[in-house]
């Protein structure tokens, strides 16, 4: 079995990647920046390694002897005040990691990008041949993910890129689980008018491992899931939890106006608002993703949303994240 290097291992997708890699018999060195991350990584069978994406020398030492890099770390902030930090992590960090991988003679670089690299500026169903417009986007998350992906595509290393859509599943503490907790507490002020493609975090991790095993170098894979409006999604959550929910969607213009109002307040408080103009724009977008290439070449599975949501809610209950029923 191989020795590999993983970033983002203490996060949502990264934790599942770590479990899949360890389960397949690989030795996983995982980037860690704190004692809490050390413990989380060790609990899943990984070897925590202290290094920083902003320090190429520390990365080169950490990568020595590794056959592959799985890069899943990212800054997903939707607040413009975090743009410089986000660019440093997503773009500069990826470039540093690529350079370190070349120096260490790593054989493959597997990069978790995002469907956001295509940007909300794209309309219709996205396929791997759809031109990416993240470089034109005013949303820094989209812009930074686009630039990071381009850096990977330009490297002489053998590479594979993955573009997951809305990731859901057990282990989610900070993504869609935040919305689910608002529904559970009946504090959701409104529902965005967009459409999402809900992807199973477990299947994303399995697809990445298969892509490496099958040496699908030079390929990009969209990893989507069942399409659903956010109204439909929230109503399914409400029904499963026995909670009332808003009946319809908040108009995009009203959501954006609310986000701008919160942004004005944030100038004085210095605290990141619950809704930002960037977040309002993305959740008002009608995202449609074609995963047929991944299904065909990686045996990727689009888990039905009701099943995926059921697993997510069961895990959240087991973690005490939902009110007792």
Locations of the language-model features?
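Conserved catalytic-site region of short-chain dehydrogenase/reductase
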Residues: 78, 115-124, 167-173
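Conserved Rossmann-fold NAD(P)-dependent oxidoreductase catalytic core, especially the SDR/UDP-sugar
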Residues: 89-140
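Conserved beta-loop-beta element that borders a ligand/cofactor-binding pocket
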Residues: 149-170
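N-terminal Rossmann NAD(P)H-binding glycine-rich loop of SDR-like oxidoreductase domains
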Residues: 4-24
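Mid/C-terminal beta-alpha module of Rossmann-like enzyme folds, strongest
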Residues: 207-275, 291, 296, 304-325
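Short-chain dehydrogenase/reductase
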Residues: 87-91, 127-130, 134-149, 166, ...
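Substrate-positioning beta->alpha
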Residues: 96, 147, 175, 192-212, ...
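NAD(P)H-binding glycine-rich loop region in Rossmannoid oxidoreductase-like domains
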Residues: 35-42, 46-92, 100
């Amino acid at each position: 079995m191989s020795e590999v290097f993983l970033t983002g291992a203490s996060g949502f997708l990264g934790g599942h990647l770590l479990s899949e890699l360890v389960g397949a018999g690989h030795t996983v060195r995982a980037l860690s920046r704190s004692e809490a991350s050390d413990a989380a990584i060790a609990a899943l069978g990984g070897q925590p390694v202290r290094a920083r994406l902003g320090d190429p020398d520390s990365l080169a030492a950490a990568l020595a002897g590794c056959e592959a890099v799985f890069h899943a770390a990212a800054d997903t902030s939707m607040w413009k005040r975090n743009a410089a930090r986000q660019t440093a992590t997503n773009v500069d960090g990826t470039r540093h990691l690529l350079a370190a991988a070349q120096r260490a003679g790593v054989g493959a670089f597997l990069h978790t990008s995002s469907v956001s690299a295509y940007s909300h500026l794209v309309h219709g169903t996205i396929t791997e041949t759809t031109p990416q417009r993240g470089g034109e986007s005013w949303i820094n998350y989209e812009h930074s993910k686009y630039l990071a992906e381009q850096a990977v595509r330009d490297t002489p290393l053998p590479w594979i890129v993955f573009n997951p859509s809305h990731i859901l599943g057990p282990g989610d503490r900070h993504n869609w689980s935040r919305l689910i907790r608002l529904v559970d507490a009946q504090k959701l002020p409104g529902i965005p008018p967009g459409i999402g493609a809900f992807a199973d975090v477990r299947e994303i991790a399995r697809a990445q491992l298969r892509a490496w095993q099958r040496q699908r170098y030079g390929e990009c894979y969209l990893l989507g899931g069942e399409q659903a409006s956010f109204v439909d999604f929230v109503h399914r959550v409400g029904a499963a939890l026995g909670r009332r929910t808003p009946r319809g969607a908040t108009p995009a213009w009203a959501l954006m106006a609310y986000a701008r109002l919160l942004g004005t307040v944030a100038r004085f408080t210095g605290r990141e608002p619950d809704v930002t103009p960037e977040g309002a724009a993305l959740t008002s977008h009608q995202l449609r993703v074609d995963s047929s290439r991944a299904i065909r070449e990686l045996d990727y599975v689009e888990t039905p949303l009701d099943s995926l949501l059921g697993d997510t809610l069961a895990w959240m209950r087991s973690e005490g994240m939902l009110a007792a029923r």
